[in-house]
Design a protein with these regions (language model features):
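Histidine-centered copper-binding motifs that mark active-site loops
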Residues: 3-10, 19-23, 34-313, 333, ...
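Exposed beta-strand face motif in extracellular beta-rich ectodomains
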Residues: 164-166, 321-323, 519
Length: 544
Protein backbone atom coordinates (compact mmCIF):
# COMPACT_ATOMS: atom_id res chain seq x y z
CA UNK A 1 0.00 0.00 0.00
CA UNK A 2 1.09 3.54 -0.65
CA UNK A 3 2.27 5.39 2.42
CA UNK A 4 1.38 8.87 3.57
CA UNK A 5 2.12 12.25 1.99
CA UNK A 6 4.96 13.03 4.39
CA UNK A 7 8.52 11.94 3.65
CA UNK A 8 8.62 9.05 6.10
CA UNK A 9 12.14 8.31 7.21
CA UNK A 10 10.86 7.03 10.54
CA UNK A 11 12.13 3.61 11.59
CA UNK A 12 9.54 1.00 12.38
CA UNK A 13 10.33 -1.50 15.13
CA UNK A 14 11.35 -4.26 12.71
CA UNK A 15 13.80 -1.91 10.99
CA UNK A 16 15.18 -0.84 14.35
CA UNK A 17 15.84 -4.42 15.41
CA UNK A 18 17.68 -5.06 12.16
CA UNK A 19 19.75 -1.92 12.69
CA UNK A 20 20.64 -3.11 16.17
CA UNK A 21 21.95 -6.35 14.67
CA UNK A 22 19.41 -8.42 16.51
CA UNK A 23 17.71 -9.80 13.40
CA UNK A 24 14.06 -10.42 12.79
CA UNK A 25 13.96 -13.31 15.23
CA UNK A 26 13.53 -10.80 18.03
CA UNK A 27 10.50 -9.25 16.43
CA UNK A 28 7.99 -11.97 17.16
CA UNK A 29 6.17 -9.92 19.77
CA UNK A 30 4.69 -7.33 17.42
CA UNK A 31 2.57 -7.47 14.31
CA UNK A 32 3.28 -5.19 11.37
CA UNK A 33 -0.24 -5.66 10.01
CA UNK A 34 -3.61 -5.19 11.63
CA UNK A 35 -5.16 -8.60 11.28
CA UNK A 36 -7.63 -10.57 13.30
CA UNK A 37 -6.48 -13.95 14.53
CA UNK A 38 -7.69 -15.67 11.35
CA UNK A 39 -5.60 -13.27 9.26
CA UNK A 40 -8.55 -11.61 7.55
CA UNK A 41 -7.98 -7.87 7.63
CA UNK A 42 -11.57 -7.12 6.58
CA UNK A 43 -13.10 -9.35 9.23
CA UNK A 44 -14.87 -7.67 12.11
CA UNK A 45 -16.62 -4.90 10.18
CA UNK A 46 -20.03 -5.03 11.89
CA UNK A 47 -20.32 -1.28 11.50
CA UNK A 48 -20.92 -1.55 7.78
CA UNK A 49 -24.63 -1.94 8.38
CA UNK A 50 -26.66 0.26 10.69
CA UNK A 51 -28.42 -1.30 13.65
CA UNK A 52 -32.17 -1.36 13.06
CA UNK A 53 -32.86 -0.66 16.74
CA UNK A 54 -30.66 2.44 16.84
CA UNK A 55 -32.42 5.71 16.03
CA UNK A 56 -29.90 8.56 15.89
CA UNK A 57 -30.54 12.13 17.00
CA UNK A 58 -27.50 13.21 15.00
CA UNK A 59 -26.12 11.70 11.82
CA UNK A 60 -22.77 12.70 10.32
CA UNK A 61 -20.86 11.83 7.18
CA UNK A 62 -17.09 11.77 7.84
CA UNK A 63 -14.42 11.08 5.23
CA UNK A 64 -10.65 10.63 5.46
CA UNK A 65 -8.87 11.46 2.21
CA UNK A 66 -5.71 13.01 0.75
CA UNK A 67 -5.80 16.79 0.48
CA UNK A 68 -3.56 19.82 0.08
CA UNK A 69 -3.53 22.97 2.22
CA UNK A 70 -1.64 26.25 2.46
CA UNK A 71 0.49 26.06 5.61
CA UNK A 72 3.64 27.89 4.51
CA UNK A 73 4.13 30.50 1.78
CA UNK A 74 4.61 28.90 -1.60
CA UNK A 75 3.71 25.34 -2.48
CA UNK A 76 0.68 23.64 -0.93
CA UNK A 77 1.41 20.93 1.63
CA UNK A 78 0.08 17.45 0.89
CA UNK A 79 -1.82 16.08 3.89
CA UNK A 80 -4.46 13.57 4.89
CA UNK A 81 -7.57 15.20 6.27
CA UNK A 82 -11.01 14.50 7.68
CA UNK A 83 -13.98 16.30 6.16
CA UNK A 84 -17.55 16.12 7.38
CA UNK A 85 -21.15 17.11 6.84
CA UNK A 86 -24.40 16.89 8.78
CA UNK A 87 -26.86 14.31 7.49
CA UNK A 88 -29.34 14.76 10.33
CA UNK A 89 -29.39 17.17 13.25
CA UNK A 90 -28.36 20.76 13.96
CA UNK A 91 -26.13 22.33 11.29
CA UNK A 92 -23.85 23.49 14.12
CA UNK A 93 -22.89 19.84 14.76
CA UNK A 94 -20.06 20.23 12.24
CA UNK A 95 -17.78 23.27 12.32
CA UNK A 96 -14.88 23.43 9.87
CA UNK A 97 -11.59 25.12 10.73
CA UNK A 98 -10.94 27.35 7.71
CA UNK A 99 -7.54 26.89 6.11
CA UNK A 100 -6.58 24.00 8.38
CA UNK A 101 -5.82 20.36 7.65
CA UNK A 102 -7.49 19.43 10.95
CA UNK A 103 -10.82 17.67 10.85
CA UNK A 104 -14.02 19.58 11.58
CA UNK A 105 -15.02 20.28 15.16
CA UNK A 106 -17.85 17.90 16.04
CA UNK A 107 -20.24 19.40 18.61
CA UNK A 108 -22.46 16.98 20.50
CA UNK A 109 -24.66 17.00 23.59
CA UNK A 110 -24.79 14.52 26.43
CA UNK A 111 -27.62 12.08 25.80
CA UNK A 112 -27.57 12.34 22.01
CA UNK A 113 -27.48 9.19 19.93
CA UNK A 114 -24.95 9.61 17.15
CA UNK A 115 -24.42 7.80 13.86
CA UNK A 116 -21.25 8.47 11.87
CA UNK A 117 -20.97 7.21 8.29
CA UNK A 118 -17.21 6.98 7.88
CA UNK A 119 -15.61 6.56 4.44
CA UNK A 120 -11.93 5.67 4.09
CA UNK A 121 -10.57 7.26 0.92
CA UNK A 122 -6.95 6.99 2.06
CA UNK A 123 -4.44 4.76 0.26
CA UNK A 124 -4.19 2.58 3.38
CA UNK A 125 -6.32 1.12 6.15
CA UNK A 126 -7.47 3.17 9.14
CA UNK A 127 -9.98 3.42 12.01
CA UNK A 128 -11.50 6.30 13.99
CA UNK A 129 -11.01 6.42 17.77
CA UNK A 130 -13.25 8.76 19.78
CA UNK A 131 -10.63 9.71 22.35
CA UNK A 132 -12.10 10.10 25.83
CA UNK A 133 -15.63 8.95 24.96
CA UNK A 134 -17.23 5.96 26.66
CA UNK A 135 -18.54 3.92 23.73
CA UNK A 136 -19.16 0.22 22.94
CA UNK A 137 -16.26 -2.04 22.02
CA UNK A 138 -16.96 -2.09 18.28
CA UNK A 139 -17.31 1.70 18.14
CA UNK A 140 -14.02 2.61 19.84
CA UNK A 141 -11.72 2.38 16.81
CA UNK A 142 -9.83 -0.70 17.99
CA UNK A 143 -7.49 -1.89 15.20
CA UNK A 144 -9.31 -5.25 15.22
CA UNK A 145 -12.05 -3.38 13.38
CA UNK A 146 -9.79 -1.98 10.72
CA UNK A 147 -11.40 -0.24 7.74
CA UNK A 148 -9.63 -1.10 4.47
CA UNK A 149 -8.92 1.66 2.00
CA UNK A 150 -11.93 2.29 -0.20
CA UNK A 151 -14.39 0.90 2.34
CA UNK A 152 -16.72 2.39 4.93
CA UNK A 153 -17.89 1.81 8.48
CA UNK A 154 -20.84 3.03 10.52
CA UNK A 155 -20.10 4.15 14.08
CA UNK A 156 -23.10 4.34 16.41
CA UNK A 157 -23.02 5.40 20.05
CA UNK A 158 -24.84 7.37 22.68
CA UNK A 159 -22.97 10.29 24.23
CA UNK A 160 -22.89 9.38 27.92
CA UNK A 161 -19.87 11.53 28.79
CA UNK A 162 -20.23 14.77 30.68
CA UNK A 163 -19.49 18.05 28.92
CA UNK A 164 -15.85 18.34 27.96
CA UNK A 165 -13.13 18.61 25.34
CA UNK A 166 -12.57 15.32 23.54
CA UNK A 167 -11.07 14.47 20.16
CA UNK A 168 -10.92 11.88 17.41
CA UNK A 169 -8.01 10.36 15.50
CA UNK A 170 -6.93 7.11 13.77
CA UNK A 171 -5.89 3.96 15.60
CA UNK A 172 -4.34 1.70 12.95
CA UNK A 173 -1.69 -0.32 14.80
CA UNK A 174 1.86 0.64 13.76
CA UNK A 175 0.45 3.47 11.59
CA UNK A 176 -1.19 5.71 14.20
CA UNK A 177 1.85 8.00 14.43
CA UNK A 178 2.22 8.74 10.71
CA UNK A 179 -1.55 8.98 10.13
CA UNK A 180 -2.00 11.55 12.89
CA UNK A 181 1.15 13.35 11.75
CA UNK A 182 -0.17 13.57 8.20
CA UNK A 183 -3.22 15.45 9.48
CA UNK A 184 -5.86 13.04 10.77
CA UNK A 185 -7.18 14.59 13.99
CA UNK A 186 -10.12 16.70 15.08
CA UNK A 187 -11.84 18.05 18.17
CA UNK A 188 -15.09 16.67 19.57
CA UNK A 189 -16.79 19.02 22.04
CA UNK A 190 -19.58 17.79 24.29
CA UNK A 191 -21.98 20.14 26.09
CA UNK A 192 -24.65 19.50 28.71
CA UNK A 193 -27.23 21.59 30.59
CA UNK A 194 -25.17 21.77 33.79
CA UNK A 195 -22.21 23.35 32.05
CA UNK A 196 -24.41 25.62 29.94
CA UNK A 197 -26.03 27.02 33.11
CA UNK A 198 -22.65 28.32 34.34
CA UNK A 199 -22.48 31.02 31.67
CA UNK A 200 -18.87 30.30 30.73
CA UNK A 201 -17.45 32.16 27.72
CA UNK A 202 -18.93 30.70 24.54
CA UNK A 203 -19.45 31.48 20.88
CA UNK A 204 -16.79 33.94 19.72
CA UNK A 205 -15.34 33.86 23.25
CA UNK A 206 -14.56 30.14 22.99
CA UNK A 207 -11.20 29.46 21.30
CA UNK A 208 -9.90 26.03 20.33
CA UNK A 209 -6.15 25.44 20.19
CA UNK A 210 -4.76 22.15 18.88
CA UNK A 211 -0.98 22.07 19.44
CA UNK A 212 1.14 19.95 17.10
CA UNK A 213 4.80 20.02 16.09
CA UNK A 214 5.84 19.45 12.49
CA UNK A 215 8.90 19.52 10.23
CA UNK A 216 8.76 20.65 6.59
CA UNK A 217 11.21 20.18 3.75
CA UNK A 218 12.30 22.88 1.30
CA UNK A 219 9.20 22.18 -0.82
CA UNK A 220 6.80 22.71 2.12
CA UNK A 221 6.09 18.98 2.45
CA UNK A 222 5.83 17.24 5.81
CA UNK A 223 8.85 15.24 6.94
CA UNK A 224 8.09 12.40 9.34
CA UNK A 225 11.30 11.43 11.04
CA UNK A 226 14.97 11.63 10.28
CA UNK A 227 15.62 7.91 9.89
CA UNK A 228 17.61 7.90 13.14
CA UNK A 229 16.91 4.69 15.09
CA UNK A 230 16.54 6.43 18.44
CA UNK A 231 13.59 8.41 17.11
CA UNK A 232 11.30 5.39 17.33
CA UNK A 233 12.46 4.83 20.89
CA UNK A 234 12.04 8.45 21.96
CA UNK A 235 9.17 9.63 19.76
CA UNK A 236 8.94 12.02 16.83
CA UNK A 237 9.64 15.72 17.38
CA UNK A 238 9.20 18.49 14.83
CA UNK A 239 11.13 21.73 14.53
CA UNK A 240 8.13 24.09 14.80
CA UNK A 241 4.82 24.18 16.65
CA UNK A 242 1.53 24.70 14.82
CA UNK A 243 -1.76 25.81 16.35
CA UNK A 244 -4.83 24.56 14.51
CA UNK A 245 -2.56 23.69 11.60
CA UNK A 246 -1.17 27.22 11.30
CA UNK A 247 2.35 28.55 11.83
CA UNK A 248 3.02 31.67 13.91
CA UNK A 249 -0.65 32.09 14.83
CA UNK A 250 -2.06 35.24 16.40
CA UNK A 251 -5.48 36.28 17.68
CA UNK A 252 -7.06 39.73 17.83
CA UNK A 253 -9.15 39.79 21.01
CA UNK A 254 -10.96 42.24 23.28
CA UNK A 255 -10.70 43.22 26.94
CA UNK A 256 -12.91 40.41 28.20
CA UNK A 257 -12.76 36.77 29.31
CA UNK A 258 -12.22 33.86 26.92
CA UNK A 259 -12.33 30.10 27.24
CA UNK A 260 -9.42 28.30 25.60
CA UNK A 261 -9.88 24.61 24.84
CA UNK A 262 -6.36 23.19 24.56
CA UNK A 263 -5.39 19.83 23.05
CA UNK A 264 -1.89 18.43 22.83
CA UNK A 265 -2.21 16.65 19.48
CA UNK A 266 1.53 16.12 19.05
CA UNK A 267 3.02 12.67 18.56
CA UNK A 268 5.40 12.87 21.51
CA UNK A 269 6.06 16.48 22.53
CA UNK A 270 5.17 17.66 26.04
CA UNK A 271 4.30 21.33 26.52
CA UNK A 272 4.93 23.51 29.58
CA UNK A 273 2.43 26.27 28.85
CA UNK A 274 2.64 29.67 30.51
CA UNK A 275 1.61 33.25 29.87
CA UNK A 276 4.47 35.50 28.84
CA UNK A 277 3.68 38.12 31.49
CA UNK A 278 3.86 35.61 34.34
CA UNK A 279 0.11 35.58 35.00
CA UNK A 280 -0.97 32.24 36.52
CA UNK A 281 -2.78 29.82 34.21
CA UNK A 282 -6.43 29.46 35.28
CA UNK A 283 -7.56 25.89 34.58
CA UNK A 284 -11.27 25.01 34.74
CA UNK A 285 -11.32 21.64 32.98
CA UNK A 286 -9.24 18.57 32.14
CA UNK A 287 -9.63 15.54 29.85
CA UNK A 288 -13.07 14.60 31.16
CA UNK A 289 -14.68 17.99 31.68
CA UNK A 290 -14.93 20.67 34.32
CA UNK A 291 -13.07 20.58 37.61
CA UNK A 292 -14.89 21.00 40.91
CA UNK A 293 -13.03 24.28 41.50
CA UNK A 294 -10.69 26.20 39.26
CA UNK A 295 -6.94 25.75 39.59
CA UNK A 296 -4.29 28.43 39.26
CA UNK A 297 -0.94 27.12 38.15
CA UNK A 298 2.34 28.91 37.33
CA UNK A 299 2.30 26.82 34.15
CA UNK A 300 0.29 23.96 32.64
CA UNK A 301 1.92 20.64 31.75
CA UNK A 302 0.19 19.08 28.76
CA UNK A 303 1.31 15.66 27.53
CA UNK A 304 0.29 14.07 24.21
CA UNK A 305 -3.43 13.29 24.21
CA UNK A 306 -4.21 15.50 27.20
CA UNK A 307 -6.66 18.39 27.12
CA UNK A 308 -7.27 21.38 29.36
CA UNK A 309 -9.82 24.19 29.45
CA UNK A 310 -8.30 27.51 30.47
CA UNK A 311 -9.84 30.91 31.22
CA UNK A 312 -7.98 33.91 29.81
CA UNK A 313 -9.14 37.19 31.37
CA UNK A 314 -8.03 40.21 29.35
CA UNK A 315 -10.23 42.72 31.17
CA UNK A 316 -7.22 44.42 32.80
CA UNK A 317 -5.14 44.57 29.62
CA UNK A 318 -4.83 47.80 27.68
CA UNK A 319 -5.88 48.03 24.06
CA UNK A 320 -2.76 47.86 21.88
CA UNK A 321 -0.87 45.45 24.13
CA UNK A 322 -0.08 41.82 23.38
CA UNK A 323 0.36 38.61 25.33
CA UNK A 324 2.31 35.47 24.49
CA UNK A 325 1.34 31.90 25.23
CA UNK A 326 4.67 30.12 25.51
CA UNK A 327 6.00 26.65 26.14
CA UNK A 328 8.77 27.09 28.69
CA UNK A 329 12.07 25.25 28.66
CA UNK A 330 12.52 22.13 30.77
CA UNK A 331 15.21 19.41 30.92
CA UNK A 332 14.95 16.91 28.07
CA UNK A 333 16.51 14.01 30.01
CA UNK A 334 13.18 12.31 30.93
CA UNK A 335 12.28 12.16 27.24
CA UNK A 336 15.49 10.70 25.79
CA UNK A 337 16.94 7.21 25.73
CA UNK A 338 19.61 6.39 28.27
CA UNK A 339 22.23 3.65 28.47
CA UNK A 340 24.44 5.62 26.10
CA UNK A 341 22.12 4.77 23.21
CA UNK A 342 21.54 8.11 21.65
CA UNK A 343 21.42 10.18 24.83
CA UNK A 344 22.48 13.59 23.69
CA UNK A 345 21.39 13.01 20.10
CA UNK A 346 18.70 15.55 20.73
CA UNK A 347 20.27 17.52 23.50
CA UNK A 348 20.27 21.25 23.05
CA UNK A 349 18.78 22.86 19.98
CA UNK A 350 17.79 19.66 18.21
CA UNK A 351 18.98 17.00 15.84
CA UNK A 352 20.39 17.23 12.34
CA UNK A 353 19.03 15.19 9.48
CA UNK A 354 20.99 13.64 6.65
CA UNK A 355 20.90 16.91 4.73
CA UNK A 356 22.54 18.80 7.57
CA UNK A 357 19.43 20.85 8.34
CA UNK A 358 17.80 20.80 11.75
CA UNK A 359 14.88 18.36 11.72
CA UNK A 360 13.65 18.67 15.28
CA UNK A 361 13.81 20.62 18.50
CA UNK A 362 14.32 18.73 21.74
CA UNK A 363 11.45 17.85 24.03
CA UNK A 364 11.74 20.71 26.49
CA UNK A 365 12.89 23.33 24.00
CA UNK A 366 11.12 26.69 24.47
CA UNK A 367 8.56 27.80 21.89
CA UNK A 368 6.32 30.75 21.26
CA UNK A 369 2.92 29.11 20.82
CA UNK A 370 0.42 31.90 20.26
CA UNK A 371 0.40 35.71 20.15
CA UNK A 372 -2.70 37.45 21.51
CA UNK A 373 -3.22 41.07 20.52
CA UNK A 374 -5.67 43.17 22.53
CA UNK A 375 -7.27 45.32 19.84
CA UNK A 376 -10.63 46.50 21.15
CA UNK A 377 -12.40 47.34 24.36
CA UNK A 378 -15.39 45.30 25.45
CA UNK A 379 -16.93 44.56 28.82
CA UNK A 380 -18.16 41.20 30.01
CA UNK A 381 -19.80 40.00 33.18
CA UNK A 382 -18.31 36.51 33.34
CA UNK A 383 -17.80 35.47 36.94
CA UNK A 384 -16.51 31.99 37.60
CA UNK A 385 -18.57 30.22 40.27
CA UNK A 386 -16.88 28.84 43.36
CA UNK A 387 -18.09 25.38 42.35
CA UNK A 388 -17.80 24.47 38.68
CA UNK A 389 -19.11 20.93 39.04
CA UNK A 390 -19.67 18.25 41.66
CA UNK A 391 -17.88 14.92 41.53
CA UNK A 392 -19.45 11.68 42.71
CA UNK A 393 -18.59 11.30 46.40
CA UNK A 394 -18.29 7.51 46.03
CA UNK A 395 -15.06 7.88 44.07
CA UNK A 396 -12.71 7.00 46.91
CA UNK A 397 -10.12 4.31 47.41
CA UNK A 398 -12.29 2.75 50.13
CA UNK A 399 -14.94 1.94 47.53
CA UNK A 400 -12.69 -0.39 45.53
CA UNK A 401 -13.23 -4.13 45.58
CA UNK A 402 -9.75 -5.60 45.50
CA UNK A 403 -6.05 -4.92 45.80
CA UNK A 404 -4.16 -2.64 43.47
CA UNK A 405 -3.74 -3.87 39.89
CA UNK A 406 -0.13 -3.09 39.00
CA UNK A 407 0.82 -2.36 35.39
CA UNK A 408 4.54 -1.96 34.82
CA UNK A 409 6.43 0.01 32.20
CA UNK A 410 9.37 -2.07 31.01
CA UNK A 411 11.99 -2.08 28.30
CA UNK A 412 12.98 -5.34 26.64
CA UNK A 413 13.72 -6.84 23.24
CA UNK A 414 14.55 -3.30 22.14
CA UNK A 415 11.02 -2.03 22.63
CA UNK A 416 8.78 -0.52 25.27
CA UNK A 417 6.51 -3.03 27.02
CA UNK A 418 3.54 -3.03 29.39
CA UNK A 419 3.74 -5.80 31.98
CA UNK A 420 6.53 -7.37 29.96
CA UNK A 421 4.28 -7.80 26.94
CA UNK A 422 3.93 -6.11 23.59
CA UNK A 423 0.70 -5.59 21.66
CA UNK A 424 -1.12 -8.60 20.24
CA UNK A 425 -4.36 -7.95 18.41
CA UNK A 426 -6.59 -10.41 20.28
CA UNK A 427 -4.53 -11.16 23.36
CA UNK A 428 -5.69 -10.39 26.90
CA UNK A 429 -3.62 -11.59 29.85
CA UNK A 430 -5.19 -12.91 33.04
CA UNK A 431 -4.35 -9.72 34.91
CA UNK A 432 -5.99 -7.62 32.16
CA UNK A 433 -9.54 -8.90 32.73
CA UNK A 434 -11.92 -6.88 34.91
CA UNK A 435 -15.54 -7.28 35.96
CA UNK A 436 -18.31 -5.01 34.76
CA UNK A 437 -19.22 -2.35 37.36
CA UNK A 438 -16.02 -2.98 39.32
CA UNK A 439 -14.15 -0.06 40.85
CA UNK A 440 -10.45 -0.71 40.78
CA UNK A 441 -7.18 1.00 41.61
CA UNK A 442 -4.66 0.64 38.80
CA UNK A 443 -1.03 1.53 39.35
CA UNK A 444 1.16 2.57 36.43
CA UNK A 445 4.68 1.71 37.61
CA UNK A 446 7.52 3.42 35.74
CA UNK A 447 10.17 2.75 38.37
CA UNK A 448 11.72 -0.41 36.95
CA UNK A 449 12.61 1.08 33.58
CA UNK A 450 14.24 4.02 35.33
CA UNK A 451 16.37 1.65 37.39
CA UNK A 452 17.59 0.10 34.12
CA UNK A 453 18.66 3.50 32.85
CA UNK A 454 15.67 3.84 30.52
CA UNK A 455 14.43 7.06 32.09
CA UNK A 456 11.59 8.08 29.81
CA UNK A 457 8.26 9.61 30.73
CA UNK A 458 5.14 7.97 29.29
CA UNK A 459 1.68 9.53 28.81
CA UNK A 460 -0.56 6.52 29.50
CA UNK A 461 -4.09 6.49 28.06
CA UNK A 462 -7.04 4.29 28.99
CA UNK A 463 -9.71 3.75 26.34
CA UNK A 464 -13.39 3.92 27.14
CA UNK A 465 -13.11 5.25 30.69
CA UNK A 466 -12.42 8.44 32.60
CA UNK A 467 -10.48 7.99 35.84
CA UNK A 468 -9.30 9.91 38.88
CA UNK A 469 -5.64 10.19 39.86
CA UNK A 470 -5.29 9.08 43.48
CA UNK A 471 -1.59 9.28 44.17
CA UNK A 472 1.88 9.82 42.76
CA UNK A 473 4.94 8.31 44.41
CA UNK A 474 8.40 8.93 43.03
CA UNK A 475 11.71 7.32 43.86
CA UNK A 476 13.80 10.17 45.37
CA UNK A 477 16.68 9.22 43.09
CA UNK A 478 14.61 10.28 40.07
CA UNK A 479 12.55 13.10 41.57
CA UNK A 480 14.52 15.75 39.71
CA UNK A 481 13.32 14.30 36.39
CA UNK A 482 9.81 15.55 37.11
CA UNK A 483 10.50 18.59 39.27
CA UNK A 484 10.39 21.03 36.37
CA UNK A 485 6.93 19.83 35.26
CA UNK A 486 5.23 18.73 38.47
CA UNK A 487 3.56 22.05 39.37
CA UNK A 488 1.72 21.95 36.05
CA UNK A 489 -0.04 18.61 36.57
CA UNK A 490 -3.84 18.74 36.81
CA UNK A 491 -4.49 15.50 38.68
CA UNK A 492 -7.53 16.97 40.45
CA UNK A 493 -9.79 16.45 37.43
CA UNK A 494 -11.27 13.63 35.39
CA UNK A 495 -8.57 12.11 33.19
CA UNK A 496 -8.14 9.55 30.44
CA UNK A 497 -4.41 10.25 29.93
CA UNK A 498 -1.80 10.72 32.63
CA UNK A 499 1.91 11.52 32.33
CA UNK A 500 4.00 9.05 34.35
CA UNK A 501 7.51 10.32 34.95
CA UNK A 502 10.66 8.17 35.31
CA UNK A 503 10.88 6.47 38.69
CA UNK A 504 7.24 7.24 39.38
CA UNK A 505 4.24 5.12 40.37
CA UNK A 506 0.84 6.68 39.65
CA UNK A 507 -2.36 5.21 41.05
CA UNK A 508 -5.72 5.84 39.37
CA UNK A 509 -9.28 4.89 40.32
CA UNK A 510 -11.38 3.46 37.48
CA UNK A 511 -15.05 2.43 37.38
CA UNK A 512 -15.77 -0.09 34.62
CA UNK A 513 -19.39 0.70 33.83
CA UNK A 514 -21.90 0.04 31.08
CA UNK A 515 -19.99 -1.81 28.35
CA UNK A 516 -18.32 -5.21 28.24
CA UNK A 517 -15.72 -6.12 25.65
CA UNK A 518 -12.10 -5.55 24.74
CA UNK A 519 -10.55 -2.09 25.01
CA UNK A 520 -7.05 -0.64 24.86
CA UNK A 521 -4.60 0.98 27.22
CA UNK A 522 -1.33 2.31 25.85
CA UNK A 523 1.32 4.98 25.80
CA UNK A 524 0.13 8.06 23.90
CA UNK A 525 3.62 8.75 22.66
CA UNK A 526 2.46 7.58 19.24
CA UNK A 527 5.81 6.11 18.23
CA UNK A 528 5.86 4.06 21.44
CA UNK A 529 2.30 2.94 20.72
CA UNK A 530 3.16 1.93 17.15
CA UNK A 531 6.14 -0.08 18.39
CA UNK A 532 3.82 -2.13 20.58
CA UNK A 533 3.52 -0.25 23.90
CA UNK A 534 -0.18 -1.04 23.93
CA UNK A 535 -2.30 -3.78 25.45
CA UNK A 536 -5.90 -4.95 25.55
CA UNK A 537 -8.01 -5.18 28.67
CA UNK A 538 -11.33 -7.00 28.74
CA UNK A 539 -14.46 -6.11 30.71
CA UNK A 540 -16.61 -9.18 31.43
CA UNK A 541 -20.06 -9.52 32.94
CA UNK A 542 -20.16 -10.80 36.49
CA UNK A 543 -20.98 -14.47 36.88
CA UNK A 544 -24.55 -15.10 37.94
Amino acid sequence: MKRGPSHERHMRRRDFLTWMGMGLAGATGASSRCQTRNGDETAGLPGRDTASSFTPDVEIALTAAPSAVQILPGALTQVWAYSGSVVKGPPSTIQSLAGSYLGPIIRLQTGQKVRVHFANQLPEHTTVHWHGLHVPERMDGHPRFIIPNGQSYVYEFEVINRAGTYWYHPHHHDRTGPQVYNGLAGLLLVSDPKEAALGLPSGAQEIVCVLQDRTFDADNQLVYGSGMPMESMNGFLGDRVLVNGQTQPSLSLATRAYRLRLLNGSNSRVYKLAWGDGTPVTVIGTDGGLLEQLLRRPYLTLAPGERADVILDLSQHRVGTSLQLRSLAFPSAPFEMGMGMGRGMRRGIGRMGGTGRQTSAANGAPFSILTIRVQRRETSNVELPATLSTFDASWHREQTEQSVRRLTVQFGRMQWLLNGRTFEMDDVAANETVSLDAKEVWEFDNSGAAMMGMRLAHPLHLHGRQFRVLDRQVDPRFAKDGDSLREGFTDEGWKDTVLVMPGERVQILVHFTRYTGMFLYHCHNLEHEDMGMMRNYRVVARAG
